Amino acid sequence: MAAFSEMGVMPEIAQAVEEMDWLLPTDIQAESIPLILGGGDVLMAAETGSGKTGAFSIPVIQIVYETLKDQQEGKKGKTTIKTGASVLNKWQMNPYDRGSAFAIGSDGLCCQSREVKEWHGCRATKGLMKGKHYYEVSCHDQGLCRVGWSTMQASLDLGTDKFGFGFGGTGKKSHNKQFDNYGEEFTMHDTIGCYLDIDKGHVKFSKNGKDLGLAFEIPPHMKNQALFPACVLKNAELKFNFGEEEFKFPPKDGFVALSKAPDGYIVKSQHSGNAQVTQTKFLPNAPKALIVEPSRELAEQTLNNIKQFKKYIDNPKLRELLIIGGVAARDQLSVLENGVDIVVGTPGRLDDLVSTGKLNLSQVRFLVLDEADGLLSQGYSDFINRMHNQIPQVTSDGKRLQVIVCSATLHSFDVKKLSEKIMHFPTWVDLKGEDSVPDTVHHVVVPVNPKTDRLWERLGKSHIRTDDVHAKDNTRPGANSPEMWSEAIKILKGEYAVRAIKEHKMDQAIIFCRTKIDCDNLEQYFIQQGGGPDKKGHQFSCVCLHGDRKPHERKQNLERFKKGDVRFLICTDVAARGIDIHGVPYVINVTLPDEKQNYVHRIGRVGRAERMGLAISLVATEKEKVWYHVCSSRGKGCYNTRLKEDGGCTIWYNEMQLLSEIEEHLNCTISQVEPDIKVPVDEFDGKVTYGQKRAAGGGSYKGHVDILAPTVQELAALEKEAQTSFLHLGYLPNQLFRTF
């Protein structure tokens, strides 16, 4: 308790932490908690299982509690920040809703960006919900630009998401990253008219008074959202006219200037100079902290940690909510209506609730992106940017938005780019460094060579069902084709997985497969061996964890594995990131991952908490043809076995190349063992029992002491001689030195 209290953690949280047997903070917690409590943005990286969740959860809970306590007691923050409310009272481009290199003149109408490599955008201070409206834009030079309309959710890069409509100088209209020919090109001295008919749901443009025709029909999901004038520039200058001055080309057909729009049609921007009116008012659906997780399992795990940490916090109590798919939305909405302080969720459902206004982000003080590299690799960068754009950078009490990013790979280009965009001078806490295999993990490779091990020929039909990639190919023995060897690899891997379990008498292991169908097939093969989900205690009892299983089943399967009801968890990489599974003695990689970082994530499941673990990877020596779905159904009902380059959904998978990349990444050569999977005892560890703690000190420590003993004795003799000499100099009758 004292260790956490010394970092400034409040006693109520420290007491809860002590009950969890956390006597001392981990390295990542000791570094990050004071930084976050101090108000800074933090980028943190540490090994899986190092306490990253606690490192951000503890300070977030404390600051949210302190904020609510201040509000309860009527305290106000000391702030000298200008509200910028006067900006919202006139039609102009919004200085609080623009890119970092986007300049706005003193009149609020003349805009410029001189960045030659990047696009920078801006939105107006007001938007519209009803009516037929028009504004003009004049081009002052020959730079590139797009003009049009967007919602508050849209990216400032107009036309690159589903919330904005743009028309560019190259004669292209753009929406949701789709650029189509429209109208004609425009450049310096041209005037573009931007028309919006909300009642009909139409957007169109004109050039120098020439009507270019219908450009877009507003989709249903945007019908109830305000649309704001918007633009994006690359080394260009524009001037807007919202109707305060006379139009060069006045609109017809009942379109009116924005400046003449009735007040009832107008919506003011949420970006109002950092202190929004809504922030001072209690909104039940406006949390103080938002934590985004890449998977439902991680979200549930984080929420459980928050519940444990806040156990003794009272007056006011903190209210948390889990927002994930697969759960009835009405249950989540009813909790939102009653008030919530901390939200933990996954991007899909969060996006739905934010876009429909059910979840309000106007009071968020903390934005936490857990496993950020996983979020980015799943394609959620646009969602993150949209969400960040909707959160005020400074709250009404003068506190700045804090952004915390946790990632297994901080040094990836995408994570660095994201941090530059949404974080404010972040502190990097990197206790992970380059990927490496922990000392407690013994990892080996088993080559799967169908040319030397002909077992697959003798099995007949009593083998694992394969993934039907070769359903239309001749894979019978004797064909000697790449397809035959590929099918043989699939069969052998099923046999080797069973052999590894029997050879090492595995009582618990995580088995990673590349695809969901591979997981299902291996589970079915274990059922044929007498095991399966319902055979508790059987040598091959197992459960599956992947995206096609129902949420309730996934949660139940994970719990059954943790409790030891079944021995094996067969999963895709969904379980490789952050899921709280401790001390698993074995991991089997049926197929190597296509991303080398995921190899470290996978084998990081074993050997935690000083327990020894063994990771066995089955690596094909020949290329294997595998599914790689690029179809819209993402594999559901797809049987297109042609190669990707031929318009199909398969690729040739080269595991030997992947193995060399992993070895280069880890700067080591991974030991190989024979197909009998008898793993020689590691010479450093002596006798090893996987899953048990290494003997403290070990035999190697004794040898180390023996080597150092003569040197230590010599140092002791020199120290004694020096001390004796000093005493003689100080106390001899004829002292040579005396202190006067």
From Swiss-Prot:
Highest levels of transcription in 2 retinoblastoma cell lines and in tissues of neuroectodermal origin including the retina, brain, and spinal cord. Residues 70-247 form the B30.2/SPRY domain. Changing residue 371 to G: Inhibits the transcriptional activity of RELA and attenuates NF-kappa-B-mediated gene expression. Phosphorylated by ATM kinase; phosphorylation is increased in response to ionizing radiation (IR). Belongs to the DEAD box helicase family. DDX1 subfamily. The gene is DDX1. The modification Phosphoserine is found at residue 481. The lineage of its organism: Eukaryota, Metazoa, Chordata, Craniata, Vertebrata. Acts as an ATP-dependent RNA helicase, able to unwind both RNA-RNA and RNA-DNA duplexes. Possesses 5' single-stranded RNA overhang nuclease activity. Possesses ATPase activity on various RNA, but not DNA polynucleotides. May play a role in RNA clearance at DNA double-strand breaks (DSBs), thereby facilitating the template-guided repair of transcriptionally active regions of the genome. Together with RELA, acts as a coactivator to enhance NF-kappa-B-mediated transcriptional activation. Acts as a positive transcriptional regulator of cyclin CCND2 expression. (Microbial infection) Required for HIV-1 Rev function as well as for HIV-1 and coronavirus IBV replication. Binds to the RRE sequence of HIV-1 mRNAs. It holds the Pfam family SPRY. This is ATP-dependent RNA helicase DDX1. PROSITE patterns: B302_SPRY, HELICASE_ATP_BIND_1, HELICASE_CTER, Q_MOTIF. InterPro entries: B30.2/SPRY (IPR001870), B30.2/SPRY_sf (IPR043136), ConA-like_dom_sf (IPR013320), DEAD/DEAH_box_helicase_dom (IPR011545), Helicase_ATP-bd (IPR014001), Helicase_C-like (IPR001650), P-loop_NTPase (IPR027417), RNA_helicase_DEAD_Q_motif (IPR014014). It is found in: Nucleus; Cytoplasm; Cytoplasmic granule; Cytoplasm, Cytosol. One of its GO terms (cellular component) is cleavage body. It catalyses: ATP + H2O = ADP + phosphate + H(+). Residues 2-428 form the Helicase ATP-binding domain. Keywords: Acetylation, Activator, Antiviral defense, ATP-binding, Cytoplasm, DNA-binding, Exonuclease, Helicase, Host-virus interaction, Hydrolase, Immunity, Innate immunity, Isopeptide bond, Mitochondrion, mRNA processing, Nuclease, Nucleotide-binding, Nucleus, Phosphoprotein, RNA-binding, Transcription, Transcription regulation, tRNA processing, Ubl conjugation. There is a cross-link at residue 281 (Glycyl lysine isopeptide (Lys-Gly) (interchain with G-Cter in SUMO2)). PANTHER family: RNA HELICASE (PTHR24031). Residues 1-295, 525-740 are annotated as: Necessary for interaction with HNRNPK.
